[in-house]
């Protein structure tokens, strides 16, 4: 089996897509939190949003690295 070559040309786009979707998920969860009276659901969604925000920090760092590498020709 041949390994695929490392093609990173669209990594920035993929990461940006994931950032956008994660932000949308956070906003949707915030809407549910505001509307629901179910404390268990609120707690679960708040915890999930905390993890999402941590993931966003990591993705933002990763996109900076990828953008820099893309600019430098992926050396």
UniProtKB/Swiss-Prot annotation:
Region (Disordered): 52-75
InterPro entries named among the record's database cross-references: SASP_thioredoxin-like
Coiled-coil boundaries: none
Pfam families noted in UniProt: Tlp
NCBIfam families in UniProt: SASP_tlp
Family that this chain belongs to: Belongs to the Tlp family.
Annotated HAMAP family: Tlp
Full protein name: Protein Tlp homolog
């Amino acid at each position: 089996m041949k390994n695929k070559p490392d093609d990173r040309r669209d990594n920035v786009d993929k990461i940006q897509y994931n950032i956008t979707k994660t932000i949308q998920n956070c906003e949707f969860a915030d809407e549910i939190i505001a509307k629901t009276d179910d404390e268990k659901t609120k707690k679960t969604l708040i915890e999930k949003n905390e993890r999402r925000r941590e993931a966003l920090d990591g993705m933002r760092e990763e996109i900076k690295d990828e953008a820099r590498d893309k600019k430098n020709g992926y050396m």
